[in-house]
Structures are given as C-alpha cells and as structure tokens.
C-alpha cells in the first residue's frame, strides 16, 4: 500500500489530456525565397494534377501537397465550378508558394468543355436537329466551313470564352490539349 500511494498523489499535471500541435510550417522567409526562385531564370518544373478537391486531412488531393519545386501545374479535370476549399487552396499556392496554374482539357471542336449546359439540355426544344447543330449555332460555327470569316469569328468567340474562364477562376493560363487521335 505504501508503494502505490505515490501513483495516486503525484503527476497531477499528466492526468489531463490535451492535443498538442508540434508542427511548425515553413517560415515567411522560406516562402519569400521560394517565390523569388520561381521568378528567376531557371529550368521550369511542370506537371499535371487531377482529382483536386482542396480539402481533407491528407494533402493528396490538394494543390498545397504539390512539391514546392514545381513551377507550373496543369489542372486536369475539376477546374470548373470550384469550391471555396479549392479557391483557398489555389490562392495559397499562387500567393504564398508562387506556383502557377493552368486549366487543361482536350479540344475536339469549338465549344468543347465550356458550352453552356442549357445548350446540351435544350437543343431539341430550341428547334435543332442535333446537339452538335445547337453547339455550332451557339458558337457561330458555319455549316459551310469554307466561310473563313465565320470560322475565324467562331474560333475567336471560343478563345475569348476560354480567356474569360481563366479570369473567372483566377488561373494563370490554359494548357491546350489537342490530341488528333482522340475522339
């Protein structure tokens, strides 16, 4: 009994459990040097990133988990209609790490990936014979492709919409993925 008494009366400060965070992230000096490096003349590191959610206990689906040495990241999928978590993740990496981000998709024709959904959903009620006819009409793509002025105007409208999308989401550019053997 005499030997067990110290167990019950000593070490009172150890009986209360509390979470302790011992992680100290990189310093502002580190990030300033990283941003300066990324602005310098050096071989650029580029990569693609998919399955982006910008949230979770693991950084596997966050831009913040990309190695600091990567200069430019092309977002493959999940680049549109981004969540608040994705916005914060993107802004952190752009502003703090100095990483640049591009949206990326395969271009099979004018309008790919950014034609408004209501065109796809309502083409029949809009009086078109096919979905593609409705898409072509929206972008001004002529049925007679020898009409160079109309083709150029359609391409310019599409390019302008891509630029607007880049600005809308705060990306740094667009990775044109044209694969002639696709589709």
Which stretches of residues belong to each language-model region?
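Bacterial Sec-dependent N-terminal signal peptides
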Residues: 1-40
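Chitinase-like catalytic core of GlcNAc-active glycosidases
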Residues: 41-183
């Amino acid at each position: 009994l005499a030997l067990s008494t110290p167990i019950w009366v000593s070490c009172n400060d150890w009986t209360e459990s509390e979470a302790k965070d011992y992680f100290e992230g990189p310093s502002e000096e580190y990030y300033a040097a990283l941003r300066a490096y990324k602005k310098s003349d050096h071989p650029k590191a580029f990569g693609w990133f998919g399955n982006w959610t910008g949230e979770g206990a693991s950084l596997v689906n966050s831009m913040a988990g990309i190695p600091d040495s990567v200069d430019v990241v092309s977002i493959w999928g999940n680049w549109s209609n981004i969540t608040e978590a994705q916005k914060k993740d993107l802004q952190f990496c752009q502003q703090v790490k100095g990483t640049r981000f591009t949206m990326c998709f395969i271009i099979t024709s004018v309008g790919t990936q950014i034609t408004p959904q209501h065109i796809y959903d309502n083409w029949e009620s809009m009086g078109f014979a096919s979905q593609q006819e409705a898409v072509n009409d929206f972008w001004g793509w002529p049925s007679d492709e020898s009409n160079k002025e109309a083709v150029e105007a359609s391409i310019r409208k599409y390019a302008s919409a891509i630029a607007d999308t880049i600005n809308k989401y705060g990306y740094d550019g667009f990775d044109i993925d044209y694969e002639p053997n696709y589709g």
